[in-house]
Amino acid sequence: MIYVNGRYMEEKDAVLSPFDHGFLYGIGVFETFRLYEGCPFLLDWHIERLERALKDLQIEYTVSKHEILEMLDKLLKLNDIKDGNARVRLNISAGISDKGFVAQTYDKPTVLCFVNQLKPESLPLQKEGKVLSIRRNTPEGSFRLKSHHYLNNMYAKREIGNDPRVEGIFLTEDGAVAEGIISNVFWRKGRCIYTPSLDTGILDGVTRRFIIENAKDIGLELKTGRYELEALLTADEAWMTNSVLEIIPFTKIEEVNYGSQSGEATSALQLLYKKEIKNMIHEKGGRAWRSTQ
Protein backbone atom coordinates (compact mmCIF):
# COMPACT_ATOMS: atom_id res chain seq x y z
CA MET A 1 0.00 0.00 0.00
CA ILE A 2 1.19 3.47 -0.85
CA TYR A 3 0.03 7.06 -0.32
CA VAL A 4 -0.88 9.29 -3.27
CA ASN A 5 -2.44 12.74 -2.86
CA GLY A 6 -4.35 12.03 0.33
CA ARG A 7 -5.40 8.48 -0.51
CA TYR A 8 -4.00 5.07 0.42
CA MET A 9 -4.09 2.49 -2.34
CA GLU A 10 -2.51 -0.59 -3.82
CA GLU A 11 0.48 0.07 -6.02
CA LYS A 12 -1.41 -1.30 -9.05
CA ASP A 13 -4.16 1.27 -8.53
CA ALA A 14 -1.86 4.28 -8.35
CA VAL A 15 -2.05 6.52 -11.41
CA LEU A 16 0.19 9.49 -12.20
CA SER A 17 -0.76 11.89 -14.98
CA PRO A 18 1.46 11.94 -18.07
CA PHE A 19 1.11 15.73 -17.86
CA ASP A 20 2.72 15.93 -14.43
CA HIS A 21 5.73 18.21 -14.84
CA GLY A 22 7.64 15.90 -12.53
CA PHE A 23 7.44 13.37 -15.36
CA LEU A 24 7.68 15.73 -18.32
CA TYR A 25 10.49 17.95 -17.07
CA GLY A 26 11.90 16.30 -13.94
CA ILE A 27 10.56 18.99 -11.62
CA GLY A 28 10.31 17.20 -8.31
CA VAL A 29 12.16 16.41 -5.11
CA PHE A 30 12.18 13.66 -2.53
CA GLU A 31 13.47 12.60 0.85
CA THR A 32 14.58 9.13 1.84
CA PHE A 33 14.87 8.30 5.52
CA ARG A 34 14.58 5.51 8.00
CA LEU A 35 12.07 4.47 10.64
CA TYR A 36 13.27 2.83 13.84
CA GLU A 37 10.43 1.12 15.74
CA GLY A 38 8.04 3.43 13.92
CA CYS A 39 10.01 6.62 14.64
CA PRO A 40 11.57 8.68 11.82
CA PHE A 41 15.12 9.71 12.71
CA LEU A 42 16.15 13.36 12.19
CA LEU A 43 12.79 14.08 10.55
CA ASP A 44 12.99 17.82 11.28
CA TRP A 45 16.19 18.06 9.24
CA HIS A 46 14.66 16.11 6.36
CA ILE A 47 11.64 18.43 6.39
CA GLU A 48 13.90 21.48 6.50
CA ARG A 49 15.82 20.29 3.43
CA LEU A 50 12.60 19.38 1.62
CA GLU A 51 11.06 22.80 2.29
CA ARG A 52 14.15 24.53 0.95
CA ALA A 53 13.99 22.47 -2.25
CA LEU A 54 10.26 23.09 -2.74
CA LYS A 55 10.79 26.82 -2.36
CA ASP A 56 13.59 26.74 -4.92
CA LEU A 57 11.40 24.89 -7.45
CA GLN A 58 8.36 27.08 -6.66
CA ILE A 59 6.24 24.11 -5.69
CA GLU A 60 3.59 25.25 -3.24
CA TYR A 61 3.23 22.57 -0.61
CA THR A 62 3.14 22.94 3.16
CA VAL A 63 5.14 20.13 4.74
CA SER A 64 3.24 19.27 7.92
CA LYS A 65 5.21 17.17 10.39
CA HIS A 66 1.99 16.01 12.02
CA GLU A 67 0.55 14.87 8.68
CA ILE A 68 3.76 13.05 7.78
CA LEU A 69 3.76 11.19 11.10
CA GLU A 70 0.12 10.16 10.61
CA MET A 71 0.89 9.08 7.04
CA LEU A 72 3.84 6.95 8.18
CA ASP A 73 1.89 5.32 11.00
CA LYS A 74 -0.90 4.35 8.62
CA LEU A 75 1.50 3.02 5.98
CA LEU A 76 3.22 0.84 8.57
CA LYS A 77 -0.12 -0.65 9.59
CA LEU A 78 -1.43 -1.08 6.05
CA ASN A 79 1.78 -2.84 5.04
CA ASP A 80 1.85 -4.95 8.22
CA ILE A 81 5.35 -3.84 9.21
CA LYS A 82 5.00 -4.90 12.83
CA ASP A 83 8.45 -3.94 14.10
CA GLY A 84 8.23 -0.45 12.60
CA ASN A 85 11.63 -0.72 10.91
CA ALA A 86 11.35 0.65 7.40
CA ARG A 87 12.82 2.72 4.61
CA VAL A 88 10.67 5.69 3.58
CA ARG A 89 10.52 7.64 0.35
CA LEU A 90 8.48 10.84 0.36
CA ASN A 91 8.24 12.30 -3.14
CA ILE A 92 6.75 15.62 -4.22
CA SER A 93 6.57 16.53 -7.90
CA ALA A 94 5.31 19.66 -9.61
CA GLY A 95 1.98 18.13 -10.55
CA ILE A 96 -0.23 18.75 -13.56
CA SER A 97 0.01 22.01 -15.46
CA ASP A 98 -1.51 23.03 -18.78
CA LYS A 99 0.90 25.94 -19.23
CA GLY A 100 3.66 23.98 -20.91
CA PHE A 101 7.33 24.64 -20.26
CA VAL A 102 7.12 28.18 -18.90
CA ALA A 103 8.23 29.82 -15.67
CA GLN A 104 5.45 29.23 -13.16
CA THR A 105 4.48 28.38 -9.62
CA TYR A 106 3.06 24.90 -9.09
CA ASP A 107 0.08 24.85 -6.73
CA LYS A 108 -1.23 21.31 -7.36
CA PRO A 109 1.76 19.06 -6.60
CA THR A 110 1.69 15.29 -6.64
CA VAL A 111 2.56 13.88 -3.22
CA LEU A 112 3.58 10.23 -3.03
CA CYS A 113 4.94 8.21 -0.12
CA PHE A 114 5.79 4.55 0.33
CA VAL A 115 7.59 2.42 2.89
CA ASN A 116 9.59 -0.79 2.55
CA GLN A 117 10.28 -3.11 5.43
CA LEU A 118 13.93 -2.96 6.41
CA LYS A 119 15.91 -5.78 7.96
CA PRO A 120 18.97 -4.19 9.62
CA GLU A 121 20.91 -7.44 9.37
CA SER A 122 20.64 -7.28 5.57
CA LEU A 123 22.48 -3.96 5.34
CA PRO A 124 26.23 -3.86 4.59
CA LEU A 125 28.57 -3.24 7.52
CA GLN A 126 31.43 -1.97 5.36
CA LYS A 127 32.14 -0.83 1.82
CA GLU A 128 34.93 -0.73 -0.71
CA GLY A 129 35.35 2.61 -2.47
CA LYS A 130 36.02 2.97 -6.19
CA VAL A 131 36.99 6.32 -7.67
CA LEU A 132 34.74 7.00 -10.66
CA SER A 133 36.02 8.12 -14.04
CA ILE A 134 32.78 10.01 -14.64
CA ARG A 135 32.92 13.33 -12.81
CA ARG A 136 30.29 14.84 -10.54
CA ASN A 137 28.11 17.22 -12.48
CA THR A 138 27.45 20.68 -11.12
CA PRO A 139 24.04 21.37 -9.52
CA GLU A 140 21.28 22.60 -11.84
CA GLY A 141 20.81 25.64 -9.58
CA SER A 142 22.70 27.35 -6.78
CA PHE A 143 22.77 24.23 -4.61
CA ARG A 144 22.30 20.48 -4.96
CA LEU A 145 18.68 19.37 -4.65
CA LYS A 146 17.61 15.83 -3.84
CA SER A 147 15.69 15.96 -7.08
CA HIS A 148 14.50 13.75 -9.92
CA HIS A 149 17.70 14.55 -11.85
CA TYR A 150 19.62 11.29 -11.39
CA LEU A 151 21.37 10.77 -14.73
CA ASN A 152 24.84 11.50 -13.33
CA ASN A 153 24.27 8.94 -10.57
CA MET A 154 22.88 6.40 -13.04
CA TYR A 155 25.91 6.67 -15.32
CA ALA A 156 28.14 6.26 -12.26
CA LYS A 157 26.22 3.16 -11.18
CA ARG A 158 26.63 1.68 -14.64
CA GLU A 159 30.36 2.26 -14.36
CA ILE A 160 30.85 0.33 -11.10
CA GLY A 161 28.00 -2.18 -11.34
CA ASN A 162 25.51 -3.28 -8.71
CA ASP A 163 27.70 -4.94 -6.09
CA PRO A 164 26.20 -3.70 -2.76
CA ARG A 165 29.65 -3.90 -1.17
CA VAL A 166 31.04 -1.19 -3.47
CA GLU A 167 30.42 2.56 -3.45
CA GLY A 168 31.52 4.82 -6.29
CA ILE A 169 33.23 8.06 -5.32
CA PHE A 170 32.83 11.14 -7.51
CA LEU A 171 35.51 13.73 -8.11
CA THR A 172 34.72 17.22 -9.38
CA GLU A 173 35.85 18.33 -12.83
CA ASP A 174 38.97 19.87 -11.26
CA GLY A 175 39.80 16.69 -9.32
CA ALA A 176 38.52 17.48 -5.83
CA VAL A 177 36.80 14.75 -3.80
CA ALA A 178 33.02 15.24 -4.01
CA GLU A 179 30.69 12.50 -2.73
CA GLY A 180 29.55 8.93 -3.23
CA ILE A 181 26.81 7.83 -5.60
CA ILE A 182 24.42 7.47 -2.65
CA SER A 183 26.48 8.95 0.16
CA ASN A 184 28.62 11.69 1.61
CA VAL A 185 32.28 10.93 2.25
CA PHE A 186 34.43 11.56 5.34
CA TRP A 187 37.94 10.70 6.45
CA ARG A 188 40.20 11.21 9.47
CA LYS A 189 43.84 12.20 9.52
CA GLY A 190 45.30 12.47 13.00
CA ARG A 191 42.86 14.33 15.27
CA CYS A 192 40.86 15.95 12.48
CA ILE A 193 37.90 14.81 10.38
CA TYR A 194 37.62 16.10 6.81
CA THR A 195 34.69 16.19 4.41
CA PRO A 196 34.09 18.02 1.11
CA SER A 197 32.37 21.39 1.38
CA LEU A 198 29.05 22.17 -0.29
CA ASP A 199 30.78 24.32 -2.91
CA THR A 200 31.99 21.09 -4.54
CA GLY A 201 28.36 20.65 -5.66
CA ILE A 202 27.48 17.84 -3.26
CA LEU A 203 24.19 17.12 -1.53
CA ASP A 204 23.82 18.57 1.96
CA GLY A 205 23.21 15.15 3.49
CA VAL A 206 21.29 14.80 6.74
CA THR A 207 23.69 12.24 8.22
CA ARG A 208 26.54 14.46 7.02
CA ARG A 209 25.01 17.28 9.04
CA PHE A 210 24.76 15.01 12.08
CA ILE A 211 28.49 14.30 11.96
CA ILE A 212 29.44 17.94 11.39
CA GLU A 213 27.36 19.03 14.38
CA ASN A 214 28.54 16.22 16.68
CA ALA A 215 32.22 15.63 15.83
CA LYS A 216 33.27 17.72 18.82
CA ASP A 217 31.49 15.27 21.12
CA ILE A 218 34.04 12.60 20.25
CA GLY A 219 36.95 14.97 20.77
CA LEU A 220 37.85 15.58 17.14
CA GLU A 221 38.10 18.71 15.04
CA LEU A 222 36.15 18.81 11.78
CA LYS A 223 37.00 20.74 8.64
CA THR A 224 35.15 21.14 5.35
CA GLY A 225 36.83 22.24 2.14
CA ARG A 226 38.05 21.25 -1.30
CA TYR A 227 40.46 18.34 -1.03
CA GLU A 228 42.48 16.45 -3.61
CA LEU A 229 42.10 12.69 -3.89
CA GLU A 230 45.52 12.25 -2.29
CA ALA A 231 44.13 13.60 1.00
CA LEU A 232 41.55 10.81 1.07
CA LEU A 233 44.00 8.12 0.02
CA THR A 234 46.49 9.05 2.76
CA ALA A 235 43.87 9.18 5.53
CA ASP A 236 43.97 7.05 8.68
CA GLU A 237 40.39 5.92 8.07
CA ALA A 238 37.46 6.79 5.82
CA TRP A 239 33.72 6.25 5.85
CA MET A 240 30.47 7.12 4.08
CA THR A 241 27.13 8.35 5.40
CA ASN A 242 23.58 7.73 4.20
CA SER A 243 20.25 8.13 6.00
CA VAL A 244 19.31 4.48 5.49
CA LEU A 245 22.75 2.83 5.73
CA GLU A 246 23.86 5.19 8.53
CA ILE A 247 27.68 5.36 8.97
CA ILE A 248 29.64 2.76 7.01
CA PRO A 249 33.46 2.39 7.07
CA PHE A 250 35.49 1.97 3.91
CA THR A 251 37.78 -1.05 4.17
CA LYS A 252 39.67 0.19 1.12
CA ILE A 253 39.53 2.83 -1.59
CA GLU A 254 41.23 1.84 -4.81
CA GLU A 255 44.39 0.03 -3.63
CA VAL A 256 44.58 1.73 -0.23
CA ASN A 257 43.52 -0.49 2.67
CA TYR A 258 42.04 0.97 5.84
CA GLY A 259 41.57 -2.32 7.69
CA SER A 260 38.65 -4.67 8.10
CA GLN A 261 37.23 -2.99 11.22
CA SER A 262 35.76 0.45 11.88
CA GLY A 263 38.44 2.99 12.74
CA GLU A 264 38.59 5.18 15.84
CA ALA A 265 36.39 8.00 14.57
CA THR A 266 34.00 5.74 12.66
CA SER A 267 33.38 3.57 15.72
CA ALA A 268 32.85 6.58 17.99
CA LEU A 269 30.43 8.19 15.55
CA GLN A 270 28.53 4.94 15.07
CA LEU A 271 28.09 4.64 18.84
CA LEU A 272 26.94 8.26 19.09
CA TYR A 273 24.49 7.78 16.22
CA LYS A 274 23.02 4.63 17.80
CA LYS A 275 22.73 6.42 21.13
CA GLU A 276 20.74 9.25 19.55
CA ILE A 277 18.44 6.73 17.87
CA LYS A 278 17.82 4.97 21.19
CA ASN A 279 17.10 8.30 22.87
CA MET A 280 14.62 9.18 20.12
CA ILE A 281 12.83 5.84 20.43
CA HIS A 282 12.63 6.24 24.21
CA GLU A 283 11.32 9.82 23.98
CA LYS A 284 8.73 9.06 21.29
CA GLY A 285 7.52 5.77 22.72
CA GLY A 286 8.92 3.57 19.97
CA ARG A 287 6.46 0.79 19.23
CA ALA A 288 3.55 2.71 20.77
CA TRP A 289 2.00 3.09 17.29
CA ARG A 290 1.18 -0.62 17.36
CA SER A 291 -1.27 -0.21 20.22
CA THR A 292 -3.69 1.53 17.86
CA GLN A 293 -3.85 -1.33 15.38
From Swiss-Prot:
Single Gene Ontology BP annotation: folic acid biosynthetic process
Disruption outcome: Requires p-aminobenzoic acid for growth.
Modified sites of kind N6-(pyridoxal phosphate)lysine: 146
Keyword annotations of the record: Folate biosynthesis, Lyase, Pyridoxal phosphate
SUPFAM superfamilies xrefs: D-aminoacid aminotransferase-like PLP-dependent enzymes
EC number(s) from the headed UniProt entry: 4.1.3.38
Record bears the keyword Protease: no
Subunit record text: Homodimer.
Name of the molecule in the record: Aminodeoxychorismate lyase
Organism in which the protein naturally occurs: Bacillus subtilis (strain 168)
Gene: pabC
